[in-house]
Amino acid sequence: MSEETPTNVWKEINTAWDGQDGYIATNPAGGSVLMGKDKQGNPGVGPMELLLVGLAGCTGMDVVSILEKKRQKPEKMEVRVLGNQKTDTYPKVFTEFHVEYLMWGNDLKEKDVEQAIQLSEEKYCSVGGTLAKAGPIHSTYRIIRE
């Protein structure tokens, strides 16, 4: 393992098998997520889906934060991520991604939304920066005015 430096830090997650079909991943702060199934058979999120969750959460947090700085806070926002996954060979990696941003807000300015998305994609979202090495990330957005 390489050393931590002032410009590099290790992140940690611990994943424990529940003895059946589930795995609980926990971070040092105590946050957790279920992969597989819980002991009652209820489905959790799959490991590959967690990559998509990470991308949606990372870019979503960036976009809202940037818009808030521009005094353009959406009333509501959803981020939908699709990953195109190989199925014919192992490992079954993602080769392309599509991110769709849905934002609700009568006062949102298209220019500010576009700039927030661009800044997230090109500068701030570490998950996107990592996944972009696996394949291109395309994005679209819609502003819903009610």
Protein language model features and the residues they cover:
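Alpha-helical metal-binding/catalytic segments enriched in His/Glu/Asp
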Residues: 55-59
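Extended beta-strand/beta-hairpin segments
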Residues: 1-53, 64-146
